[in-house]
């Protein structure tokens, strides 16, 4: 431990800390623009200057200065105040000062720090620099004249996202942040640069000019666009969801979210189901009241045997809805209920067989990884960023069996066919050696493997290999299943599976073509296989007029994930509670 003094307060910090981190531990807030906890140190904004003794007779950049024993640090002296005022003056020399029309206004670091450390007068009378706008795709709006060259966006895209699409060209006043070839940022996490930008140089295009921060209501909830369960904040104004921002959760998403999580909200106001519908004698859907819809369902279900009835649960079904469906169909003596609409062969051998056992933060402790039948970059971008972070720390060989789809880290590629699993038994193979030598090896099994025709045999062989490589030990279980849907783990937990004599989802879709089923209840099921449901009477319960609604005989509208209190269980088996967003005036669709 290192002892040092911050503003006359003696503290102890661990070796390797910077002066800025030491000041924060002492409860002193240091202004900064370029420094970020999760990015490398750049030290180029100079806003974090402090006075350090013993040392040079000038202020030092605290973000890049290592803390050493016996340092006396002053953060509030006249020297520090003058230095910060001077730095702020330089930063504002070329800034357009267009706060009234800037989307960052009201939550801008430059605004806040200019008020705290800047001057109310200017000495700069020359023309300001103007920079041509850059094209960064449909999500990121640029106004590079506002840029202060903190390079947070460049470091994020290179270090966290793993794409080298952003960089700085030129020096001094001529320096510009650019995508080099005027192209979109090729990353599933690209819009995180909006959150990182301390000024209004990078803002959200879909959110542009919609609202000011103080006009918004905030609701802390959880994302359902993948199975990770990223923690998010949903901002609303009136009856509209305007934006989604990440919330800090070190165990799950740290402080990143995917672009899909951030921008899928535009679907909340399009193609919504707002009333019950019943198909008439002419084959057309017409509006109905709830009594008519339920009577239509009752009339059909009363004259059908239980073995001719089935219920399928979609990818976005919450735990409460899944449990209610299970109880309802159990009372009807129905055996044909399934939540595995993609045909995955999981859930029949205990909970450890279908969750991410090591937990997401367990990636930080692993020392070797085998990815089997999964593409984390597309299926779980936040988890993929965590794998990349662990790779950058070193001593973390990664192997892949499956489609080699340009992951953001190098892999030992073994092939894309299920038969390639046999290569793991070859003692001369480098992958065999790395997994055998690892103390905490990890296997991530994706839905690509579990929906394969030979998935049961593959799963058995993978578990056998996991024993050989020591993936499962007394104090470590690195055998992980990566789901792609938010509702799957919770539905499996409450037992939404067919009985021994029941039909699975894969069988239901094929059997319905053969007319063995007469009644199917779909809860949020919208995959293309439902188009095969020609003969059965179909009830669709959901919130959007998607594929399932098109084949339905009765439609019951429901609430989307932002509109109800409910529970989701993420891929690691962690239950998380969702809250309805803070609409100030909105009549929701009559909720099924």
Q: Across the structure, where does each feature detected by a protein language model lie?
A:
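Eukaryote-biased recognition of intrinsically disordered, low-complexity regulatory segments
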Residues: 1-7
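Conserved small/polar residues in nucleotide/adenosyl-binding loops
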Residues: 584-590
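Fe-S ferredoxin-like electron-transfer domains
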Residues: 46-223, 228-232, 238-240
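Serine/threonine-rich, repeat-prone extracellular segments and beta-strand-based repeat modules
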Residues: 33-42
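Short beta-alpha connecting loops at secondary-structure transitions
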Residues: 5, 69-75, 177-182, 409, ...
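Short, structural beta-strand-to-alpha-helix junction motif
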Residues: 17-21
């Amino acid at each position: 431990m290192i002892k040092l003094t911050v503003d006359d307060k003696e503290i102890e910090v661990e070796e390797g800390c910077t002066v800025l981190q030491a000041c924060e531990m002492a409860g002193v807030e240091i202004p900064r623009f370029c420094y970020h906890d999760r990015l490398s140190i750049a030290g180029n904004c100079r806003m974090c200057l402090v006075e350090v003794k013993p040392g040079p007779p000038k202020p030092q950049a605290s973000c890049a200065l290592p803390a050493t024993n016996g340092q006396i640090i002053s953060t509030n002296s006249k020297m520090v105040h003058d230095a910060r005022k001077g730095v702020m003056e330089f930063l504002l020399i070329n800034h357009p000062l267009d706060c009234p029309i800037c989307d960052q206004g009201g939550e801008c670091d430059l605004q806040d720090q200019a008020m705290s450390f800047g001057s109310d007068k200017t000495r700069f009378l020359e023309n300001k620099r103007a920079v041509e706008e850059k094209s960064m795709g449909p999500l990121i709006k640029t106004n590079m004249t506002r840029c202060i060259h903190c390079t947070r966006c460049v470091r994020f895209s290179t270090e966290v996202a793993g794409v080298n699409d952003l960089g700085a060209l030129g020096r001094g006043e001529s320096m510009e942040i650019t995508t080099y070839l005027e192209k979109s940022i090729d990353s599933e996490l690209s819009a995180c640069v909006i959150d990182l930008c301390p000024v209004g140089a990078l803002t959200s295009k879909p959110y542009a000019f919609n609202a000011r921060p103080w006009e918004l209501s905030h609701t802390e909830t959880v994302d359902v666009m993948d199975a990770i369960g990223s923690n998010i904040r949903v901002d609303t104004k009136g009856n509209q969801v305007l934006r989604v921002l990440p919330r800090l959760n070190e165990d799950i998403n740290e402080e990143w979210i995917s672009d899909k999580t951030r921008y899928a909200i535009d679907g909340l106001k399009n193609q919504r189901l707002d009333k019950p519908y019943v198909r008439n004698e002419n084959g057309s859907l017409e509006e109905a009241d709830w009594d008519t819809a339920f009577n239509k369902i009752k009339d059909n279900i009363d004259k059908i045997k239980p073995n001719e009835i089935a219920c399928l649960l979609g990818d976005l079904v919450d735990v409460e809805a899944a449990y209610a469906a299970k109880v309802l169909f159990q009372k009807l003596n129905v055996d044909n209920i399934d939540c595995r609409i993609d045909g995955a062969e999981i859930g029949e051998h205990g909970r450890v067989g279908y969750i991410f056992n090591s937990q997401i933060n367990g990636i930080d402790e692993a020392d070797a990884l085998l990815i089997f039948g999964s593409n984390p970059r597309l299926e779980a971008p936040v988890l993929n960023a965590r794998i990349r972070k662990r790779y950058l720390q070193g001593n973390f060989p990664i192997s892949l069996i499956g489609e080699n789809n340009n992951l953001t880290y190098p892999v030992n590629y073994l092939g894309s066919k299920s038969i390639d699993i046999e290569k793991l038994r070859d003692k001369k193979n480098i992958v065999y050696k790395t997994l055998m030598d690892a103390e905490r090896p990890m296997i991530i099994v994706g839905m690509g493997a579990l929906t394969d025709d030979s998935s049961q045999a593959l799963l058995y062989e993978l578990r056998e290999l996991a024993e050989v490589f020591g993936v499962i030990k007394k104090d470590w279980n690195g055998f992980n299943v990566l789901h792609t849907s938010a509702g799957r783990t919770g539905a499996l937990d409450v037992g939404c599976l067919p009985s021994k004599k029941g039909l699975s989802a894969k069988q239901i879709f094929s059997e319905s073509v053969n007319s063995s089923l007469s009644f199917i209840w779909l809860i949020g099921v919208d995959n293309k296989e439902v188009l095969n449901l020609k003969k059965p009477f179909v009830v669709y319960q959901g919130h959007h007029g998607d594929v399932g609604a098109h084949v339905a005989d009765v439609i019951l509208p429901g609430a989307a994930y932002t509109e109800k209190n409910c529970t989701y269980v993420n891929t690691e088996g962690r239950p998380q509670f969702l809250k309805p967003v803070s609409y100030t005036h909105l009549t929701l669709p009559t909720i099924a």
